[in-house]
Amino acid sequence: MIIWISSYPKSGNTWVRSFLSAYYYSKDGNFNFELLSNIKQFPSKDFSRRKVLSVDDASKNWLVAQKEIVSKKKIFFLKTHNIYGAYKGNKFTTPEFSIGQIYIVRDPRNVISSLMNHYSIGEKEALDMICSPYRNLKDKNDVEDYSSYSFISSWANNYKSWKNSDIKNKLLVKYEDLETDTEQSFIKIIKFTNNLINNSSDVDKNKIKKSIENTNFETLKKKEKIEGFAEAILDEQGNKKTFFNLGKNNNYKKLLNISTTNKLEKIFNKEMKELNYI
């Protein structure tokens, strides 16, 4: 069965994956980027036996690939930015394959500045991206292969789709809580996942502290600078963009035009109020 680590892009998914990798896949809470291979991105080439030639083809492969995953009779963590929904009648996932989900949500005003750096786009284009109900993602390096195709829709649609999913076990995590109450937030995540994987052992608070220490933003940023980061995307010149970029310095009040924040607060008013962002 699958436990989804889901989010709109640049909302803290990699942080949560890194922490879970350090906690569950190391002996002492130490972390290296190779551990992330234990929590793969879905969809991706890792789950396709052949070249996927179109969006339609990609969507038809979603459940086929997941059926093969769950046939292994193990529980897998998978990362995704896809919405919980369907494309032309092809469902992304179902409760049949999904034992639980952790959805990470982040204030869209701070998501925008991260999108700008990550995708080398301007403020207007980032605003258009986060508001578009038709937005999708595909690995730039795979020009003719749609294995990695993800339909992410808008920030609000992405959030609502997972919030309202019919997966039985759900946990909503706010990025802001990860920043301000890190230890308690990750303890909550571990208690949730331990229950799903039938791990009856007590939460190892020492290992949690070590995992947090080894996956905090500054540590990951230093590791990326020294070692590089395989998941960083390429800019137009073919150079890898810095993945761990701003961290706590990502403050929309200092980085965005007031007109952009006003538009976001108007377009996403209902969801932002629901999440106490406004």
Kindly give the residue locations of the regions a language model identified.
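Short, compositionally biased low-complexity segments
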Residues: 183-187, 232-245
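PAPS/PAP-binding and catalytic site of the sulfotransferase fold
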Residues: 12-26, 172-199, 211, 219-222
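Acidic/histidine-enriched alpha-helical segments
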Residues: 204-214
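Composition- and surface-driven signal marking solvent-exposed, interaction-prone regions
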Residues: 185-186, 203-204, 278
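PAPS-dependent sulfotransferase catalytic domain
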Residues: 1-173, 238, 242-278
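Acidic/polar loop patches that form or flank catalytic/metal-binding clefts of enzymes
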Residues: 31, 198-206
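Short acidic/His-enriched helical or mixed secondary-structure segments at domain edges of catalytic enzymes
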Residues: 212-239
